[in-house]
Amino acid sequence: MRLESVAKFHSPKSPMMSDSPRATASDSLSGTDVMAAMGMAQSQAGFGMAAFCGKHELSQNDKQKAINYLMQFAHKVSGKYRGVAKLEGNTKAKVLQVLATFAYADYCRSAATPGARCRDCHGTGRAVDIAKTELWGRVVEKECGRCKGVGYSRMPASAAYRAVTMLIPNLTQPTWSRTVKPLYDALVVQCHKEESIADNILNAVTR
């Protein structure tokens, strides 16, 4: 069973998994089985489960839990980033909270996010390769150059920068780019890593 099945399980528009045998093991899981598997996955990959469930609007509580997990991670690695490491206690905590909140919002974006769908590929992540289409006489697709194949635009890091400057007014754009933004980017990446870990664990416990 994969994490995407959890989202379908919680969707009222999707058929619930039942006890009747189906084509795959995850399809034959009962509601009780699914909840038990989620509990096991949460005990081993709480960050990833909270991040995913919050991302798919399954729980508002999970959104806050994911941000809290991300803040803990940010505190742990902040010493590697000069622009954050030198900050005083209260200011540092507030900056990390801002970075974690914006990073999680970026992770949550998808083609379904209002205003985020790529204008070139309309959320598919694919675009027509005009040169090869003309050369071969048939439609040839390629990865969308605008969105890099994901189907949507990322949240502009400038939004996080503006929020951080409310706490650090003298933070210049170049300094942000060199000493703070790398941490912001690392937080976004960590969300995806934790989701992948949770996905693998959930798959393992439902085999």
Curated annotation (Swiss-Prot):
Belongs to the phage antitermination Q type 2 family. A zinc finger (unnamed) spans 118-147. Keywords: DNA-binding, Host-virus interaction, Metal-binding, Transcription, Transcription regulation, Transcription termination, Zinc, Zinc-finger. One of its GO terms (biological process) is transcription antitermination. Transmembrane segments: none annotated. HAMAP family: Antitermination_lambda. The keyword Kinase does not apply. Coiled coil: none annotated. Mediates the switch from middle to viral late gene expression by associating with host RNA polymerase (RNAP) so that the latter can read without pausing and through transcription terminators preceding late genes. Competes with host factor sigma 70 for binding to RPOB, the beta-subunit of host RNAP. To join the elongation complex, binds a specific DNA Q-binding element (QBE) and interacts with RNAP that is paused during early elongation. Participates in the lysis-lysogeny decision by activating the expression of the late lytic genes. SUPFAM superfamilies: DnaJ/Hsp40 cysteine-rich domain (SSF57938). Interacts with host RPOB (via flap domain); this interaction renders host RNAP resistant to transcription pausing and allows it to read through termination signals. Interacts with host RNA polymerase sigma factor RPOD (via domain-4). Interacts with host NUSA (via N-terminus and AR2 domain); this interaction releases the autoinhibition of NUSA. This is Antitermination protein Q. Changing residue 134 to K: Increased binding to QBE and increased suppressor activity. It comes from the Viruses. Pfam families: Antiterm. Zn(2+) binds at residues 118, 121, 144, 147. Residues 1-28 are annotated as: Disordered. The record marks 134 as: Interaction with host RNA polymerase sigma factor RPOD. It comes from Escherichia phage lambda (Bacteriophage lambda). GO terms for molecular function: DNA binding; zinc ion binding. The keyword DNA-binding applies.
